[in-house]
Design a protein with these regions (language model features):
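General small-molecule cofactor/ligand-binding pocket signal
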Residues: 16, 44-46
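Structured adenosyl-cofactor binding patch, chiefly the S-adenosyl-L-methionine
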Residues: 122, 126-170
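Single conserved hydrophobic/aromatic residue that forms the stacking wall/gate
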Residues: 1-9
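S-adenosyl-L-methionine/SAH cofactor-binding core of RNA-modifying enzymes
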Residues: 49-114
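Short, well-ordered alpha-helix to beta-strand connector turns
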Residues: 41, 81-82, 132
Length: 170
C-alpha cells in the first residue's frame, strides 16, 4: 500500500454474442482489437448458443420463444451493475464520439462496466431491449453478425482512444 497514490480499476467491457465467430479473418480482427483494448479495459467475449428454429418460415410465436430463451441467457451473462448496450435494428444511430461520451459518462459516474450485446439472426428479445441503457444501430444496412462483431469491437476501441485523447480517431 502506497500512501497518496490512487489507483483506478479498469472498467469491464463484455461483448455478449449469440452465435459463434467461425470465419478466421473476423476472429483475427476481433482478437487484434481485443488486444488493443487491454490498455483501456478488461474485455471479455461471451458466446452463447443460438436457439435452433427448424421451420424455414417459422411463426412469430416460435421466433419469440427462441428469442426469449436467448434473452434469458444474455441477461444471465450480464455482470451485476453493468449497463447493457444492445445492438438492434430499431436502435438509435450514434457516432463514434457519442459512444465515447456514453462510456465516459459511465466511467465518471463510477459505474463504468458495460455489456455490449449482439443477438442472433432473429434479433433480441423485448426483455433485453427494455433492460438496455442504450440501444443503437450501425445503420440501415444489413451485415452478417460476425462482421457486426468486428465493427463493434473496433468502435469500442475507437471510443476508448477518443476518451484517452489519442490520435487513432480522425
Amino acid at each position: 500500500f502506497v500512501t497518496g497514490v490512487q489507483t483506478c480499476a479498469l472498467p469491464i467491457f463484455d461483448l455478449i454474442c449469440v452465435g459463434k465467430l467461425n470465419a478466421k479473418y473476423f476472429a483475427e480482427g476481433v482478437a487484434e482489437y481485443q488486444k488493443r483494448l487491454a490498455a483501456f479495459a478488461s474485455f471479455r467475449i461471451v458466446e452463447l448458443p443460438e436457439e435452433k428454429i427448424e421451420e424455414k418460415n417459422a411463426s412469430d410465436a416460435v421466433v419469440k420463444k427462441a428469442l426469449d430463451k436467448e434473452g434469458r441467457a444474455i441477461l444471465g451473462s450480464v455482470r451485476k451493475g453493468a449497463a447493457i448496450v444492445a445492438l438492434c435494428i430499431e436502435g438509435k444511430q450514434i457516432s463514434s464520439e457519442e459512444l465515447a461520451q456514453f462510456l465516459a459518462d459511465r466511467a465518471n459516474s463510477g459505474a463504468g462496466d458495460v455489456a455490449f450485446v449482439i443477438g442472433s439472426s432473429h434479433g433480441l428479445s423485448d426483455e433485453v431491449k427494455r433492460a438496455a441503457a442504450l440501444r443503437f444501430s450501425m445503420g440501415r444496412i444489413t451485415m452478417p453478425h460476425q462482421l457486426a462483431r468486428l465493427v463493434l469491437t473496433e468502435q469500442i476501441y475507437r471510443a476508448c482512444t477518443i476518451n484517452a485523447g489519442m490520435k487513432y480517431h480522425k
